[in-house]
């Protein structure tokens, strides 16, 4: 809940609501997740919190976190990776540490929403990671060993690459996709 929502429900000023929520936090009744955002029902889902951190810009969980949740990698990242239309940043909260990365609007999408949580599809998590390898240098330059599920649709990667406006960036992304698919095919036949 937002501080303003608490103020409206209680019929008090935002300042009084903030003081009341801070007192309730000291008593252990609520958790301050981010400035102006509170959880009244215990520890919120870390994937739900992701959208709070980028508000008013939309976001979804992707990259290594989505790869892990979708079963493509066995490693479980400590950091929760998020893509957004907002700026790139790292945010530490009581729920976890978030690494937010900006995508251009034409590449925003390819996620499923359930109970307010937005999670990239397997294909989009792979695409986002390959795409951001160009912009983020070393951070995403090496993908861990990936096990593609039987229902993985490689053509979706190229569909997303087609949406990249800059010809050089599109060419780089397609080359990364081709290398990735060739490498995973070699790994699966070994």
Where are these regions (language model features)?
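Nucleic-acid-binding surface
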Residues: 40-190
């Amino acid at each position: 809940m937002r501080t303003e929502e608490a103020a409206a429900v209680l019929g008090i000023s935002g300042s009084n609501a903030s003081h009341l929520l801070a007192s309730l936090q000291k008593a252990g009744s609520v958790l301050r997740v981010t400035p102006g955002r509170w959880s009244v029902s215990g520890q919120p889902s870390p994937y739900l919190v992701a959208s709070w951190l980028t508000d008013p810009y939309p976001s979804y969980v992707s990259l290594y976190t989505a790869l892990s949740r979708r079963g493509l990698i066995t490693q479980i990242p400590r950091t929760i990776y998020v893509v957004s239309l907002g700026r790139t940043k790292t945010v530490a909260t009581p729920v976890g540490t978030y690494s937010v990365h900006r995508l251009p609007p034409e590449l925003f999408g390819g996620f499923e929403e359930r109970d307010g949580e937005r999670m990239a599809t397997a294909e989009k998590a792979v695409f986002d990671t390959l795409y951001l390898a160009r912009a983020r240098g070393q951070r995403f330059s090496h993908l861990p060993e990936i096990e593609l599920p039987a229902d993985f649709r490689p053509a979706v990667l190229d569909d997303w690459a087609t949406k990249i406006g800059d010809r050089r960036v599109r060419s780089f992304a397609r080359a990364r996709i081709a290398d990735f698919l060739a490498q995973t095919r070699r790994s699966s036949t070994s």
